[in-house]
């Protein structure tokens, strides 16, 4: 018996909608990263992008437990001397709540070209509106 290796052209991709309202950020990101990678499929192959597309709605209603809103920081560099910036998650959630989910999921994907390709399958929106009706996405209920 030979080990099965998925071929990129044979992978069938679905579109899923996940509602982030009332779900903890880390648990949500972990489930989304798993779906984007394709680990929920029997044809999962580590070196092939076998994952599905995920649309996350209501990004502003995701939960950060404990004191993370005030203590957790997002650090980034402007690429100028002395350009290290810090922003608390409270301000990040007020200005760009979709970015908090994107950062959490991106950190759980492989750090290579395949991970960047997988990351492009994540769409995060504020509110319950999205513009992907043509893809006929299925609503996926996560029990977390």
UniProtKB/Swiss-Prot annotation:
What PROSITE patterns does the database record attribute to this sequence? Answer: RIBOSOMAL_L13
Q: Which GO terms describe its cellular component?
A: cytosolic large ribosomal subunit
- GO molecular function list: mRNA binding; structural constituent of ribosome
Q: Which GO terms describe its biological process?
A: negative regulation of translation; translation
Please verify whether the record's keywords include Ligase.
no
Source organism, top-level taxon: Bacteria
Assigned keywords, A-Z: Ribonucleoprotein, Ribosomal protein
Q: What does this protein do?
A: This protein is one of the early assembly proteins of the 50S ribosomal subunit, although it is not seen to bind rRNA by itself. It is important during the early stages of 50S assembly.
User: PANTHER family from the xrefs?
Assistant: LARGE RIBOSOMAL SUBUNIT PROTEIN UL13M, RIBOSOMAL PROTEIN L13
Similarity section: Belongs to the universal ribosomal protein uL13 family.
- Which HAMAP family does the entry link to? Ribosomal_uL13
Assembly information from the UniProt record = Part of the 50S ribosomal subunit.
Q: What is this protein called?
A: Large ribosomal subunit protein uL13
Instruction: Name the species this protein comes from.
Output: Ruminiclostridium cellulolyticum (strain ATCC 35319 / DSM 5812 / JCM 6584 / H10)
Organism placement in taxonomy: Bacteria, Bacillati, Bacillota, Clostridia, Eubacteriales
Gene, per the UniProt record = rplM
């Amino acid at each position: 018996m030979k080990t099965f290796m998925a071929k990129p052209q044979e992978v069938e991709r679905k579109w899923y909608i996940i509602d982030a309202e009332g779900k903890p950020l880390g648990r949500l990101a972990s489930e989304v990263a798993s779906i984007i990678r394709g680990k929920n499929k029997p044809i999962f192959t580590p070196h092939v992008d076998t994952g599905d597309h995920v649309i996350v709605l209501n990004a502003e209603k995701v939960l950060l437990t404990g004191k993370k809103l005030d203590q957790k920081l997002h650090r980034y560099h402007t690429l100028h001397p002395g350009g290290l910036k810090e922003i608390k998650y409270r301000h990040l959630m007020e200005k760009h709540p979709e970015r908090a989910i994107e950062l959490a999921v991106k950190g759980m994907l492989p750090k290579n070209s395949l991970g960047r390709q997988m990351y492009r399958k994540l769409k995060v929106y504020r509110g319950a509106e999205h513009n992907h009706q043509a893809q006929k996405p299925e609503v996926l209920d996560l029990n977390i």
